[in-house]
Swiss-Prot record:
Protein's GO biological process: isoleucine biosynthetic process; L-valine biosynthetic process
Name under which the protein is recorded: Ketol-acid reductoisomerase (NADP(+))
Organism: Prochlorococcus marinus (strain MIT 9301)
Reactions listed under catalytic activity: (2R)-2,3-dihydroxy-3-methylbutanoate + NADP(+) = (2S)-2-acetolactate + NADPH + H(+); (2R,3R)-2,3-dihydroxy-3-methylpentanoate + NADP(+) = (S)-2-ethyl-2-hydroxy-3-oxobutanoate + NADPH + H(+)
Protein family: Belongs to the ketol-acid reductoisomerase family.
Recorded metabolic or biological pathway in which this protein acts: Amino-acid biosynthesis; L-isoleucine biosynthesis; L-isoleucine from 2-oxobutanoate: step 2/4; Amino-acid biosynthesis; L-valine biosynthesis; L-valine from pyruvate: step 2/4
Primary role: Involved in the biosynthesis of branched-chain amino acids (BCAA). Catalyzes an alkyl-migration followed by a ketol-acid reduction of (S)-2-acetolactate (S2AL) to yield (R)-2,3-dihydroxy-isovalerate. In the isomerase reaction, S2AL is rearranged via a Mg-dependent methyl migration to produce 3-hydroxy-3-methyl-2-ketobutyrate (HMKB). In the reductase reaction, this 2-ketoacid undergoes a metal-dependent reduction by NADPH to yield (R)-2,3-dihydroxy-isovalerate.
Signal sequence, renumbered to the chain: none
Binding of NADP(+), residues: Y25, G26, S27, Q28, S51, S53, D83, E84, F85, Q86, G134
Record-linked InterPro entries: 6-PGluconate_DH-like_C_sf, KARI, KARI_C, KARI_N, KARI_prok, NAD(P)-bd_dom_sf
Cofactor comment: Binds 2 magnesium ions per subunit.
Annotated keywords: Amino-acid biosynthesis, Branched-chain amino acid biosynthesis, Magnesium, Metal-binding, NADP, Oxidoreductase
Gene this chain is encoded by: ilvC
GO molecular function: ketol-acid reductoisomerase activity; magnesium ion binding; NADP binding
Length: 329
């Protein structure tokens, strides 16, 4: 059984007398910065000139500097920028300010795993990745709880990188819930696979195909939306709370029987083979290469696909129906 680590396993005092620079102040950035600040740490924020987040960070009681200035002042640098922007910002603003003894950290391993960022040997390189969105990380911390997190060490120059990563995880509230040790390779590959094969790519296409099948068979689009998209959350919430078994305990016998006899007709050995191909593209760097090239061209394919998908009938129907649900407003 994989070992989990909690508050008593991590020493927050290791962060004393260290200035922590949070680079970026979006969903994760604001949560990391404020949780660390409330844990008694010296936190500053690094943003590009003219960032819309600057006024928010200042109103939250944080000192804001340019990315370069923040990295120069900091002992610990946490990069919380979108994957496609990290390399350029690192080369121009962060790398010139790295000195022996500093800690470079990430919340996702993409740029390290695929060699886009290559830190010098004299810094620690670690990862602390909460398994939840930033607003949840902040909310849970404020309520005396925490969001589980992953932590990893890629490079241990100081000899204390593992303990430091665990201390940071404690500072943002992760050890209240439990933290799990991994490595950059494992975190990156599993995260990308989950997004592509199940959570985003797989689920989106499953929902659309189900909707299309019903509409093409003559059923009302509104009913197709309810059955194939709206109710997804009801089932997923049950799965998250108690696993597949509890979900099946909570649905009707008719639904459970249909689950067993029809699910495998859709998700079968051929589907799994395709999943394995997706995983291979992630492992051998094909996906990363294609994504980087797409971003270098200013995302023409992604923009085209985004526009096409936004025009799908399910989006039009959903926009109308969501106004019926007061809790979604």
């Amino acid at each position: 059984m994989t070992q989990l680590f909690y508050d008593t396993d991590a020493d927050l005092s290791l962060l004393n007398n260290k200035t922590i620079a949070i680079i970026g102040y979006g969903s994760q950035g604001h949560a990391h910065a404020l949780n660390l600040k409330d844990s008694g740490m010296d936190v500053i924020v690094g943003l590009y000139k003219g960032s819309k987040s600057e006024s928010k960070a200042i109103s939250d009681g944080l000192k804001v500097f340019s990315v370069s200035e923040a990295c120069e002042k900091a002992d610990w640098i946490m990069i919380l920028l979108p994957d496609e922007f990290q390399k350029d910002v690192y080369l121009k603003e962060i790398e010139p300010n790295l000195k022996e003894g500093k800690i470079l950290s990430f919340a996702h391993g993409f740029n390290i795993r695929f060699g886009l960022i290559k830190p010098p040997s004299f810094v620690d390189v670690v990862m602390i990745a909460p398994k939840g969105p930033g607003h949840t990380v902040r909310w849970e911390y404020q309520n005396g709880q925490g969001v589980p997190a992953l932590f990893a060490v890629e490079q241990d120059s100081s000899g204390s990188a593992r303990s430091l990563a665990m201390a940071y995880a404690k500072g943002i509230g992760g050890t209240r819930a439990g933290i799990l040790e991994t490595n950059f390779k494992e975190e990156t590959e599993t995260d990308l696979f989950g997004e592509q094969a199940v959570l985003c790519g797989g689920l989106s296409e499953l929902v659309k195909s189900g909707f299309e099948t019903l509409v093409e068979a003559g059923y009302q689009p509104e009913l197709a939306y309810f059955e194939c998209l709206h109710e997804v959350k009801l089932i997923v919430d049950l799965m998250v709370k108690g696993g597949l078994s509890q979900m099946r305990d909570s649905i009707s016998n008719t639904a459970e029987y249909g689950d067993y006899v029809s699910g495998k007709r859709l998700i079968n050995s051929d589907t799994k083979k395709e999943m394995q191909k997706i995983l291979k593209d992630i492992q051998d760097g094909t996906f990363a290469k294609n994504f980087v090239e797409e971003c270098d061209k200013d995302k023409p394919l992604m923009t085209k696909l985004r526009e096409e998908n936004s025009k799908h009938e399910i989006e039009k129907v959903g926009k109308s129906l969501r106004s019926m649900f007061s809790w979604l407003k």
